[in-house]
């Protein structure tokens, strides 16, 4: 009986160790890169070049690190598989959760690696009108340049928002076994800058 228990414990330890190693390997995997704005210089038509720049940026905007917090409903999603958040948190009136379950209860000022808990001082869901989950890159483009659906921003404001905002920047340093968004925040900001300067055109639907 003791030997059987010992065997079961050994199997459990091996399973946990294997899971941890797999998670570590996943966290060490380099994210896909982003093409630089210069890569699109050969596109002579300015509008077509602008649309191509946004299509490249779309690799970031449609990544789970972004769409999980820009959900179609009132519940955030989590993980690379975009599962519904557990425990079942909901948006609340201000995007920071319900009075009894504020986002900040679990999501503190920084990532908490022992618990694989993401964190940032302003952790919250994007407003409903900024939902991207399930949308095409073209649909997100039309939305993100519309002040009524982008938080009241001009397209020029998006350069700093995507390129410098620290909550947005969390997507490139998510911790745990979460895959980071493609490229770097600086590269994403450069794409937004080039997109705006070429007229902020959107890809064809």
Where do the language-model regions lie?
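Post-cleavage N-terminal segment of exported redox proteins
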Residues: 2-52, 64-68, 72-77, 193-205
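Generic detector of leucine side chains in alpha-helical contexts
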Residues: 5-11, 21, 34, 53, ...
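General "foldedness" signal
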Residues: 23, 71-74, 80-83, 117-120, ...
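Electrostatic cytochrome c docking/interface patches
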Residues: 39-60, 76, 80-96
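C-type cytochrome heme-c attachment and multiheme electron-transfer modules
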Residues: 48, 55, 64, 117-205
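The canonical Cys-X-X-Cys-His
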Residues: 65-73, 100-110
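Gly/Gly-Pro-rich "capping" loops immediately C-terminal to redox-active cysteine motifs
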Residues: 78-104, 113-145
